[in-house]
């Protein structure tokens, strides 16, 4: 089992006095949830691990109800400290305002609940953190797996790493490229575009954004002029539109 360096960061920050919310942010399918599972095996403090994936988005009370349950548990069990973990928190409408309210309540009343947030949508996390939680969080970036990690875990060659990338979930399919492409499209690309971009940003030309993504993949690692891209796109509009869409894709 690969132990990523970010695990030590999580452990260290959870051992410190309560000060900031810890936010694990990174691309899909790079092991954020696995890191939390590894952390839980080492943690001696009472924890509550929640996932908002199946919660109805407009159920804003869900976060507050779960949070209050932790407070009640701490009081009944005589706990001086508790770690609350919420995965896919960005799927709850107005999540950041609710988290701010509950976090500030605990701060005012000296309730020692430490908080870890995870999310697969960088756009939604970014919007929520900048809107309501400025000054209250620290970001722990979870990047793609490095070549060293992929080599150790899956015996990747450098050529395989350059071609297939640092996605551990897809690594078992590299000997069947058709299946690998299907997995990448269904598990990573489509959710990133459909859920993280089209559902959170006002995109007037979604077909153009998809074309731009495909061209970006074809020219990965190359420098290419906007004018050249326009010539390969249908209904491309102007270069400022392309620049905005590229920025959105980069943030997703």
Name these PLM-found stretches.
Residues 32:
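Conserved lysine of the Walker
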Residues 24:
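Hydrophobic anchor at the beta1->P-loop junction of P-loop NTPases
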Residues 96-117:
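Conserved catalytic/switch belt of AAA+ P-loop NTPases
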Residues 35, 39:
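Hydrophobic positions on the alpha1 helix immediately C-terminal to the Walker A/P-loop
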Residues 144-252:
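Interdomain hinge/linker elements that couple catalytic modules in large macromolecular machines
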Residues 49-80:
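Short glycine-rich substrate-engagement loop in P-loop NTPases that contacts/grips substrate
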Residues 1-17:
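N-terminal pre-Walker A segment at the start of P-loop NTPase domains
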Residues 123-138, 154-155:
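Short regulatory helix/loop adjacent to the ATP-binding pocket of P-loop NTPases
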């Amino acid at each position: 089992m690969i132990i990523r360096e970010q695990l030590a960061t999580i452990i260290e920050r959870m051992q410190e006095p309560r000060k900031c919310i810890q936010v694990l942010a990174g691309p899909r399918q790079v092991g954020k949830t696995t890191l939390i599972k590894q952390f839980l095996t080492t943690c001696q403090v009472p924890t509550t691990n929640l996932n908002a994936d199946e919660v109805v988005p407009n159920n804003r009370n869900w976060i507050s109800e779960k949070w209050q349950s932790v407070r009640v548990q701490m009081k009944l069990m005589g706990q001086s400290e508790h770690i609350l973990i919420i995965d896919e928190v960005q799927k709850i409408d107005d999540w950041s305002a609710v988290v701010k309210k509950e976090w500030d309540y605990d701060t005012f009343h000296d309730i020692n609940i430490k908080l870890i947030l995870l999310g697969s949508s960088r756009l939604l996390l970014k919007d929520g953190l900048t809107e309501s939680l400025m000054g209250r969080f620290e970001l722990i970036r979870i990047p793609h797996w490095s070549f060293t990690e992929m080599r150790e875990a899956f015996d990747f060659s450098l050529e395989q790493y350059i071609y297939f990338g640092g996605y551990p979930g897809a690594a078992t399919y590299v000997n069947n490229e058709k299946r690998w492409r299907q997995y990448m499209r269904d598990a990573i690309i489509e959710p990133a575009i459909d859920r993280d971009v089209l559902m959170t940003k006002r995109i007037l030309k979604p077909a153009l954004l998809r074309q731009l993504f495909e061209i970006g993949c074809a020219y990965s690692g190359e420098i290419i002029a906007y004018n050249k891209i326009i010539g390969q796109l249908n209904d491309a509009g102007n270069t400022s539109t392309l620049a905005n869409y590229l920025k959105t894709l980069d943030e997703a």
